[in-house]
A protein has these predicted regions:
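Conserved alpha/beta-hydrolase catalytic His-Asp/Glu region
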Residues: 58-59, 79-136
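Catalytic histidine-centered segment of alpha/beta-hydrolase-like enzymes
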Residues: 176-187
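Structural beta-sheet core signal
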Residues: 23, 49, 144-146
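Active-site loop/oxyanion-hole signature of alpha/beta-hydrolase fold enzymes
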Residues: 1-24, 187
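Short, hydrophobic alpha-helix immediately C-terminal to the catalytic nucleophile
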Residues: 34-38, 190
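Flexible "cap/lid" loop of the alpha/beta hydrolase fold
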Residues: 38, 44-75
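Conserved serine/cysteine hydrolase catalytic core
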Residues: 117-163
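Gly/Ala-rich beta-loop-alpha elbow adjacent to hydrolase catalytic centers
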Residues: 24-33
Length: 201
């Protein structure tokens, strides 16, 4: 997370970009946006953190055990097509007009490219990235989205983000699971974004 944010910040600054009108990040991308906003090196006018992952607030040994749990869970999905389809049913997670068999063939092949080291790094960084004690004051208008079907899983993230960013608004998206809105319903996603950004049709 920290490395990605540093690289993005450097790139923006090298290209003369000193502020952003809007920013969006989902899941791990939401973790990156949380870190980006906290540092405040490049002010953002409006930000949407969609089911963003926040740092664990527990002892190191428990964080290591949680990382091990996530690692093995993800590893099972990468090794078993049946587990992949049970966790993410093709009838729900295939875009209209796409062949679910071809889509999941490609997804399964892609997941196998992840090394054990990469998987561990992803989960450790997503849940243990550093934040300053208090975020930079930039006047950003921000909102945290989550799918209502993942509300229990996001509970600790919501609790943390509300405490860390007091101005953060929270919005549950009906009938949606993790990252489902942006991945499966682009028109609805645009509608929600326009509503937040106060853009007219």
């Amino acid at each position: 997370v920290e490395m990605t944010v540093d690289e993005v910040t450097d790139w923006l600054q090298q290209h003369g970009i000193t502020n952003l009108e809007a920013a969006y990040g989902c899941s791990l991308g939401g973790a990156c946006l949380t870190h980006f906003l906290a540092l405040g090196k490049i002010p953002v006018k409006c930000a949407v953190i969609d089911a963003g992952i926040t740092p664990y607030q527990m002892p190191l040994i428990l964080r290591r055990l949680a990382c091990l749990r996530d690692f093995w869970g993800f590893s099972l999905i990468t090794k078993s097509r049946k587990i992949l389809e049970a966790a993410y049913p093709p009838e729900r997670w295939t875009l209209p007009g796409c062949d679910p068999v071809k889509e999941y063939d490609a997804l399964a092949a892609y997941l196998k490219t992840y090394s054990k080291h990469t998987i561990r790094n992803i989960f450790w960084s997503a849940n243990n990235y550093a934040l300053p004690p208090e975020p930079a004051e930039t006047g950003c208008r921000m909102i945290y989205w989550y799918g209502e079907e993942e509300k229990k899983a996001r509970r600790s993230n919501i609790r943390f983000i509300k405490r860390y960013f007091p101005q953060m608004r929270i919005r549950g998206i009906p009938k949606m699971d993790h990252a489902e809105l942006v991945m499966m319903y682009p028109q609805e996603f645009c509608r929600y974004m326009k509503e937040f950004l106060n853009l007219e049709e």
